[in-house]
Every structure is written in C-alpha cells, then in structure tokens.
Amino acid sequence: MEEDVFPKAYDPKGLEDKLYAFWEDAGMFTAQSASNKPPYAIIMPPPNVTGILHMGHALVNTLQDVLIRYKRMSGFEVCWVPGTDHAGIATQTVVERHLYSSLGKRRIDFSREEFLEYVWEWKEKSEGIILSQLRQLGCSCDWSRLRFTMEPLASRAVKKAFKVLFDRGHIYRGYYLVNWDPVLQTALADDEVEYEEKDGWLYYIRYRVVDSSDEIIVATTRPETLLGDTAIAISPDDERYSHLLGAKVHLPFVDREIPIIGDMSVDPLFGTGAVKITPAHDRDDYRTGINHNLPLVNILTPTGKINENGGIFAGLSKEKARDDIITALDAMGLFVKKEPYTLRVGVSYRSGAVIEPYLSKQWFVSVDSFRDSLREFVASDSIKIFPPEFTRNYLSWVNNLRDWCISRQLWWGHRIPVWYHKSDEDRIICYDGEGLPEEVAQDPDSWDQDPDVLDTWFSSGLWPLTCLGWPDVEAKDLKKFYPTSVLITGHDILFFWVTRMVLLCSAMVGEKPFSDVFLHGLIFGKSYKRYNNLGEWTYISGEEKHAYDMGKPLPKDVTAKWEKLSKSKGNVIDPLEMIDKYGADAVRMALCSCANRGEQIDLDYRLFEEYKNFANKIWNGARFIFGHISNLTGKDLADGINQNLLGLEDYYILDGFNRLLKELESAYQSYAFDRVTTMAYEFFRNDFCSTYIEIIKPTLYGKQGNDEDRLTKQKLLAVLLVNILGVLHPIAPFVTETLFLKLKEAIGVIVDASSDEITAHALNMLRADSYVLAPYPQAMRITIPDNLHASFALAERLVYTIRNIRGEMQLDPRASLEAFVICPEGVSVDTYVPMMCALGGLSSVEHLTEEPKDRVYSLGVVEGIRLGVFVPIEQITKEKNRLEKEKIRLEKAIESVSRLLGSENFRAKANPDLVSAKEEALKNNRMELQSILDKLASFS
C-alpha cells in the first residue's frame, strides 16, 4: 500500500478539523422535529459564557456525545441542544476585574446600562472560544439550535415562569435572614454556600443583671455580634438560672437592656448553658427571636463592616471589631476567658468570602407545595437517577428543603419583572410581557423596577423548556423532544441545578424535564509534595511532575496524593493541551475509560498515552486489513459469505462480536461508559487483532487453504472492520470516520443489495456518507456450533502449551518450529491446527501414534492430547548446558537445606514457621530437579 495514502502512524492533526467541518457543513448534526423516528434528546449543561474548556467540561460533553452518536446510529432522531450560561455572579466578577485592570474603574463608576454594554461585549467575544473548543472535542451538537440563557426566548421564559409562580402565590418577598456574600454584596441560596472547618475560639463573656449583683456568663464564637443581641436564653429547666427568668441584663457599648428568656432549644450542656440571642445574624437565633417577638438589630453593612447600630465600633471590619470588643470587655471586667474551638464556617462558592447571615429584603420561592411532587418523580422511578445511591441523597435533600432565595444584588442577569410604586412600595405590578406594563408606561416617573436580578439557577432551571421553544407550547421541538431523555452532569450540582429543573419545569408544563439523570464523579488529579527537613512542603509542577505522572519512581522526600484539580496544587490537566498532544479520540477514550459512577474520578495522565497508542493500534490494524482487501468490491460483499467455509476462528470472532453488542447495549442502558470503552478496547485489541487476525494470517498470505478460503477471510475482515469501527465510533469518532471513508473509497460504490446474514448490514452501513449517518452494527445471524467455546478454549490451551514450551526452552520466538500430537482414540485436533500454527509459530503439526525416538522434543499434555515441539539441533547443546547449570545449582541447594533440616539443634531452636518453610523449599527444589533430569534424559 502506498505510504502517502495510508501512513504507518495515525496523526490526528489536520484530520480532525477537516472531518468536523465535513460533518457540520453537511448538516449531519441537525435534528428534524418532523421526523417519524423515535426522539432522543439531551440538553447540554451550559458552560459559563466567559469560561474556557476545562477537564470537567471535556468529561461531561464527551459522555453526552458518546450517547448522542450511539443513539443517532441506533435509529433515533437525536437532538443535542448546545448553549452557554450567562453565569451572573461569575461573569459580572470577571468583567469587573477586567474593567479595573484595563480602565482603572469599578462597576459603580458606570451607569447600569453602560456596565451591561461592556458585559455584552465581553460575552460576544468570549462565547465563541468555548464553542470552538467543544468542536475540537468532537461534540456533534445541533449548532442550529444554539441557546444562551439571556437570549430573548430565555428572557420570555424566565418572565413567564416568574409571573406564573407569583400569581399562584409561590413567590413572595420579605425581610429574612439570607446568606450574604460581603465581597460580591449579594444574597446566595443555601446550596451556594460551602462549609469548611476552621480553628477558632470560644469566648466567655460576662453579662451583668440589671438592678442586681447577679451576672450570667455566655459562651460565643462571635463576640462582635454582641452589639446586636436582643436577649439571653436559658433552658427553662436549668435550675442554675431559673431565678433569673424575666430579669434583664445590661448590654455594654450600645446602652440597651435585654431580657433573659426561657427556650427549650437551649442545650444546658453547651458552654455555660446560657446563650446570647442575635436574631439578625444567626438562623437559630432568628427563629428564637420570632417565637419570642424579639427585635431584630442588624449591625453589619452590605460590605461586612459594623454599621451605625454598632456605636463606637461603627465603620470597623468585623475582625477588627471583634478584637477591640474583647479588649474593651477585658478592661471592663466582662471578659472571662477564651478556649480553642473548631468552627464550621460557611464560605461563598464564588468569592471565597465568609458568609454572613444577614437580614435583607429578598424574593423567595416557597417550596412546600412542590415537595411532594419533587419526591414522587424520583421515588416512583419516573425520573431514574444513576448511580442509584444518589437517589437517597436527593430524597433526603428534598425532605429538608428550605425556601429558595432567588434575588441577587447584581446588574448582570434577568431583571426581576416587578415594578413598585414610589409612594407605596406595597403597590406592585408583576409583568411578563414585552416593554413596560401599561400602568407604568402611562406614568413612568411614579414607578421603579426592582433593581435586583434573578439567581442564575432560576433561568438554568428552565433550560430544558427554554432550549425546546417554551413558552410557546406549540413549538415543534417542545412537542417532539420534551421531556428530554437524559441529563448528564456532575453529582456536585444535583441540588444546585437538577432539583431546580424538576421543580420549575414540572410547575410550568406539568411534566418532568427528563427521564434519566446520570451523575458522574468529580475529576481528581495527582499532586506531588516535596518535604524539607523542617516538615515544610511545596507542590511540584512542570517537567518533574510530568515525569512522576508517567511513572518515574518517587524519591523519599516526595509524596503523591489524588486531589481536586487546582492550579495551586499543580495538578490541573488542560484538555486542549491533551487534544493537541494526543488527539481528541485519545482524550475522549481516556475520559470514558475512567468515568466510573462514584464520587471521584482519578484521572491518570498515562491514560492519554495509552489511548493515543490504542488509536494508533486501530489505525494500523485497519492498515493491515486494507493491504489484504484491496481487491474486494461491493459486489463481492453482496455475493455474501459461504458459511460452509467458516473455520473455528471465524465462528468464534463472529459470536464474540454478537456477544459484545449485547454487553454494550446493557452498558449503555446503565450509563457504564467505562465498561463501554473497556469492552470495545479489549475486543479490538485482543480478540480481533491479537487472536483472530494472527490466526488467519497464513490464509491471507496463501500459506494455508485455497483461493476461495482466502476470499472468504478477506470478506469477513471487511465486514468485521466496518462493524467494529462502528462500535468504536461513538467514543473515537475521528479515527474511525477516517478509516470508514477510506474503506468506502476502497470498496467503491455499492449498488447491489445483499440478503446474506453476515454481509447485508455491513453493506447498509457502507452506503451511508458517514458513520454519523450510518446504522449501528447489528448482530449477525449465524448458526454457532454447539461446542464452539469448549473447542476454542481447548485450542487456546494447546497454543499456550506451545508458547510455554518455547519459553522454557528459550527458543527464538521468530523461529518456525515443527510439532507432533498423539491424540486419544476418537479425538482430532485438525480443526485446531491452523490456530496452533498461527499463534504458536509452528510450520507443521504431525499426527503420530507414539512418541518419536530419533528426535529431541519437549512434551506437554492437554486433556489427554500429547503435544510435542521438536527442538532445533542448534538449540539442543545450548539448552543442555543451561539445564546442567541449573541441575548443579539445585543439587547444592538441596544438599544445604537437607543438612540444615537434619540438624537436631536447628529443629530445636528454629521457629516452627521457618522449619516449615525450609521443608517446603526442599520439596520444591527436588521436584524442579526431577523435571530437569527428565528433560536432560529426553536429549539422550
């Protein structure tokens, strides 16, 4: 074969871009909503519009694409809708930083409209980057349906959903404690808060009872919130303090008197048994305050500093105020002591700031009326969660769900569609139409629109509907593809996003948004730390880290650990770099191979190298086949295959392929992407290349069989190649498509149909312009011999015996040897001879009735079949010398151990285990010596 037509190594560079352009330009990814095919739809989890492709994106989109390609080939009308997320907090933060670094200006230096112009400009520039990167990965999305969470359709959907929920009484506004991010200056939902354990202090503070010499000591982790205290609470059953119930204590610095109240929520065993109540800055205290009708005193500004309610501490940061308050209390004799204490601190998932419980007027979705339906969808298996163990997590979370704070103090996002009358804020209009509400348009100076925007997850929660055309209930895509088939996402946003979609979509249209949810694990990378003599450590990066990733042994001062991907830890793997270095197929297969269904995916860097080599194996396997089927035509395949000419190895590979298809179907149904990849990998590499092709090589080269046998093998190779590449296509689309197009070109235009049970479907596949449009491989209807697997297993054991003899005799693996067999009565190995010769490196197998006396051979026995391999003359002397040396070594070892075991002193003093070990060693050495003596005798 011409080298320039089919180079020896697969080089994906250049090929991948051309193939993707071929697919996209031909409209192969475009779904037809009028199709009669069964629907299969996936809505892409939208990446942030300002982001770039990271390994998590690469994983989730590879898994989706594998399913989409598989289902498209399986006869479904597939619709994979791509899109990007406006990502309110994240995008606004990025643009603010950009404006400050480039112009030296902050957001507040612009009007809202001016700032949003910059954000839209940023969006237009950056959106194309991640979309082009998805193309590099091979994602076969329907780009004609590209969506953005703030496009006009999405805006209509969001306003419609808000108004529907508002009119039904499911959305309300009020002053409540929210999770406040003092850096971003916005409220966050409960599940946007991450919790960390930090070392802190438990401070003991003395409160003096008014008009009494009594005092009460309280333990707190946040002494600065003393400024907002409105009560001291004790357990009503706590006899230590029962005499103080109803009394008041003096609150220092702010000159207030606050009551001592009884509340059953107080734990008498924690601290001193008395707790300070700060309803405006603690959720538990808030509930206590409501129950006891206590005032709510907010002491913080939106930036996290002490406000005017803090008296002399106003304007200080909470950290500075804490220190100054403790110093002042100490001077007043009111500070008792402090003790080390481990704190559970809430942190913003976006800014990393410590979250403050903060009293603020916000919009909420009441979830109580949705709780039953959220639970029922999953409990009834209407929505199935994979892996199923996450079902328990989902149901537990739903049972403990609190009202969802949906307002955000941002400029970038969906503006809340509510207007307030300037003279009466309780007079409001909720409007979901275009432009202004009629009443506002008639008197615009008297109305203000709510300045806040909706939580990003509100618009994302409508994503399956938005992508398919809602709120137009007659939209063709909505009718054809809703509910969608499966949602694939990381388990970390099960509550952020998955539950919100179930809630909002079902509330809008009365139906679930998807049938299945597959939650993949989070990617971990290996990090390496180097420790010095002082116990200090640093993370290792660069070439040294890469060397360890590729298997270099670790020195004593370096330790390795699987950790979440982090630039600071040096364990981030850039998927674009991997694509450039190894090719998109290698990256896809590596990710699929480790896409287990647990919580953590340990992404071994060596997988990329392994699957690059496998892509090359696919290429070279096909290259070999092309060299032997160049004379085949479509007519040859249409003529079919004479099953009477099929050998054991042919039936075995065909049956194996049929079994593979069944196992793959099961794996796809359970979203076992790792099994899909591993099974396809092992079948191609081991069963097809290393076994089947090696067995039939003598026939292909004309050393066995006749021309008709050779043509049969050639046809079967072509059929198997197009089918196996078809199985591999969803996970490795580029190399398989390249080979498919070459195969079509080699075989030529296929005109004739075929009814042959082996070739018919392969011909149908080859009629397609691309694997993208080709039907998925089907099981071939063949009659399998009853004893196929037992026979093949026997043949494999015979081959293993031959290889074992070659190894023991240290025979040249390239040398072609002669062998003989002596079979029990009624047993024949004729069927196995081609396989024995091809895989065992034999030139011939002679049938004898007794062992030969005139030649040297090495003998093995398999199920009563005596198999002898003749040793070449030149090897005999060399092997005899080796055996003689080994004989001497064993004789010395036997003598030494025998002498030791014969010593009564040794047996009396030695550990019984040591004695047993020596006896076992002596036994093994004697057996090995006898084996060598037998071999030497065979040379005589």
UniProtKB/Swiss-Prot annotation:
EC numbers on record: 6.1.1.9
Keywords from the named record: Aminoacyl-tRNA synthetase, ATP-binding, Coiled coil, Cytoplasm, Ligase, Nucleotide-binding, Protein biosynthesis
Binding residues annotated for ATP, in chain numbering: 567
UniProt keyword annotation of NAD present: no
Domain of life assignment: Bacteria
InterPro entries: aa-tRNA-synth_I_CS, aa-tRNA-synth_Ia, Anticodon_Ia_Val, M/V/L/I-tRNA-synth_anticd-bd, Rossmann-like_a/b/a_fold, tRNA-bd_arm, tRNAsynth_Ia_anticodon-bd, Val-tRNA_synth_C_sf
Leader sequence residues: none
Reactions accelerated catalytically: tRNA(Val) + L-valine + ATP = L-valyl-tRNA(Val) + AMP + diphosphate
Keyword Zinc-finger part of the UniProt annotation: no
Top EC class for this record: ligase
One GO process term, biological-process aspect: valyl-tRNA aminoacylation
Positions of short motif 'HIGH' region: 47-57
Location of the motif 'KMSKS' region: 564-568
Location in or out of the cell: Cytoplasm
Gene Ontology cellular-component annotations: cytosol
NCBIfam families referenced in this protein's UniProt entry, alphabetically: PRK05729.1, valS
Family stated for the protein in its record: Belongs to the class-I aminoacyl-tRNA synthetase family. ValS type 1 subfamily.
Protein name (Swiss-Prot/TrEMBL): Valine--tRNA ligase
Organism: Chlamydia felis (strain Fe/C-56)
Chain's gene name: valS
